[in-house]
């Protein structure tokens, strides 16, 4: 099933931690040619029609809620269409708290959450099976890095079943460096959504760009690393200050600057 979206902005998706895009085709369209004839990662942020496709329906802890990630379609060098697919971040190594007695995380990176990524994921639709309604979490296409959503199978943390009732999404949604494109050179945002698909808040201030995170299972906290755009040029580099934000996963509205 394909739909046509009005492109407000979109770019090439690569997740925060290093990975390779799972494709064996030669992509002649991953980059846009600018006015000078140079190849630029990402596409013009201005209005442009493009095709999208879905991959699969994702079950969540809330039985009436289903997520449908949406991907931009591309054409290979032979003119055949293809699109990204849902991929999961999982951890199998027997290390740390996840393998202590009373903890069963079903290979999830974070207790109670599935974490997904996919090449050029541009939106996600929330299906409410009770009301038969759907809702796009973003009004316009964005560049999604990853989505954390409540796992359909309950994990246990410190001998207790753990429940999650919200989503967290890391994405690029603005041409912050004003170069005409939305891509990984822009500031990366981190948003909190409720299970109705409403955006609750930005977990990290907009003048920061998320660069990574790690999970503290002892305290059920997500430590988010972000660099401050101190010179206000719309992108960040290694010379700009790196800070740590603590997201209490029991009450994610409470985000504290640790460093």
Model-identified regions with their sequence ranges:
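Sec-dependent bacterial lipoprotein signal peptides
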Residues: 1-15
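Bacterial signal peptide processing site
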Residues: 17-21
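Structural signature of eukaryotic scaffold interfaces centered on beta-propeller domains
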Residues: 32-105, 117, 148-163, 174, ...
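Beta-strand C-termini and the immediately following turn/loop, strongest in propeller blades
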Residues: 113-117, 168-175, 223-230
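Beta-propeller blade signature
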Residues: 121-129, 183-196, 239-251
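Beta-propeller fold detector
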Residues: 135-140, 200-205, 253-259
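Conserved beta-propeller blade repeats
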Residues: 143-168, 207-224, 259
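Acidic, glycine-anchored loop motifs typical of Ca2+
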Residues: 161-162, 176-184, 229-238
């Amino acid at each position: 099933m394909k739909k046509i979206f009005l492109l407000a902005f979109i770019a090439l998706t690569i997740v925060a931690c290093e990975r390779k895009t799972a494709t064996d085709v030669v992509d002649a369209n991953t980059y846009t040619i600018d006015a000078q004839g140079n190849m630029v990662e990402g596409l013009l942020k201005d209005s442009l029609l493009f095709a999208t496709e879905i991959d699969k329906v994702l079950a969540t802890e809330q039985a009436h809620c289903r997520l449908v990630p949406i991907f931009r379609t591309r054409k290979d060098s032979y003119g055949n269409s293809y699109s990204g697919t849902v991929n999961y971040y999982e951890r199998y190594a027997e290390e740390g708290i996840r393998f202590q007695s009373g903890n069963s995380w079903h290979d999830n990176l974070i207790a109670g959450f599935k974490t997904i990524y996919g090449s050029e994921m541009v939106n996600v639709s929330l299906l409410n099976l009770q009301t038969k309604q759907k809702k796009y979490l973003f009004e316009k296409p964005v560049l999604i890095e990853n989505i954390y959503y409540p796992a359909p199978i309950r994990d246990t943390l410190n001998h207790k079943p753990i429940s999650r009732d919200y989503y967290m999404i890391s994405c690029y949604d603005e041409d912050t460096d004003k170069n005409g494109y939305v891509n990984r050179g822009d500031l990366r945002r981190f948003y909190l959504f409720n299970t109705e698909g409403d955006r609750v808040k930005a977990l990290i201030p907009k003048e920061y760009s998320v660069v990574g995170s790690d999970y503290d299972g002892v305290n059920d906290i997500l430590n988010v690393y972000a660099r401050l755009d101190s010179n206000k040029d719309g992108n960040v580099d290694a010379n700009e200050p790196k800070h740590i934000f603590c997201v209490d996963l029991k009450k994610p509205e409470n985000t504290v600057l640790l460093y």
